Amino acid sequence: MSATNQSWRMLLPHDGMIGMSPQVGRVSVPMAGITHLRTSDGRRCPALRGVWSEAGRSLYVLLVPYDVRVSRMMQDVNRGDVIEFVGMSGERRDAGGDTHYAVVVHDMNVVRTNASRMENGN
């Protein structure tokens, strides 16, 4: 749990869809583990893959931590958890025409689900 003001959570929708602003949302984590992206200047950047449900469809989104605090929180995420976040979103299209979504996460909250509790033996 973050020690910062989490008044942004009031904007979270209860049906799993995007909130009042594209920077606030909720994603589920189907697979645990941090992946690393390589930036254009050669640095490695940690990221977590989540599933964003919106308008009856599911989209994969990469969650990229804004700072070390958020990065540490992401390392504790288990398969089946739900992440509520606030951040800056963006999308890009690759050469094949596929659209990729990413969010630079400024603050987040991890909601443990029954599946993640059972995986950890709790």
Regions picked out by a protein language model, each given a short descriptive name:
Residues 1-122:
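OB-fold and OB-like single-stranded nucleic-acid-recognition modules
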